Swiss-Prot record:
Function as written in the Swiss-Prot or TrEMBL entry: The glycine cleavage system catalyzes the degradation of glycine. The H protein shuttles the methylamine group of glycine from the P protein to the T protein.
Species lineage: Bacteria, Pseudomonadati, Pseudomonadota, Gammaproteobacteria, Candidatus Pseudothioglobaceae
Residues bearing the modification N6-lipoyllysine: K65
Protein name as it appears in the record: Glycine cleavage system H protein
Gene: gcvH
Cellular component per GO, a single term: glycine cleavage complex
Length: 124
């Protein structure tokens, strides 16, 4: 059973979003997604200040099995990328909700996300 944290919201494409307040958010891929992908070998992160439109791919996680795009849940601006993943992409596997986060972003339009209960239902 995949770990799902109650303090986050989730997308249909298996990303988690943590509201930091002040219209800033932290984002990563879910435990379910990292388990399906397998051992991470590379993460292509966006640049700070990149502006991304809703539903656009802005990041790629690459595992021994496949490469998978990460899609924007809103119109957003990247304010930080997790540079630790450059040297340790496996943090996405070992700590997807903590040290393995992908980006922090600013947005005024994050909507249509699922709470932990709704996300658990789509996994079953």
């Amino acid at each position: 059973m995949s770990e799902i944290r109650d303090d986050r919201q989730y997308t249909q494409t298996h990303e988690w979003i943590l509201d930091n307040g002040d219209d800033t958010y932290t984002m990563g891929i879910t435990d379910h997604a990292q388990a399906l992908l397998g051992d991470m070998v590379f993460v292509e992160l966006p640049n700070v200040d990149d502006e991304v439109s809703i539903d656009d791919e802005f990041c790629v996680v690459e595992s021994v099995k496949a490469a998978s795009g990460v899609y924007s849940p809103a119109d957003l601006q990247i304010i930080e990328a997790n540079e630790a993943l450059d040297d340790e992409p496996e943090l996405v596997n070992s700590s997807c909700y903590d040290d393995g986060w992908l980006v922090k972003f600013k947005s005024h339009s994050v909507v249509d996300l699922m709470d932990s209960t709704a996300y658990a239902q789509i996994l079953n």
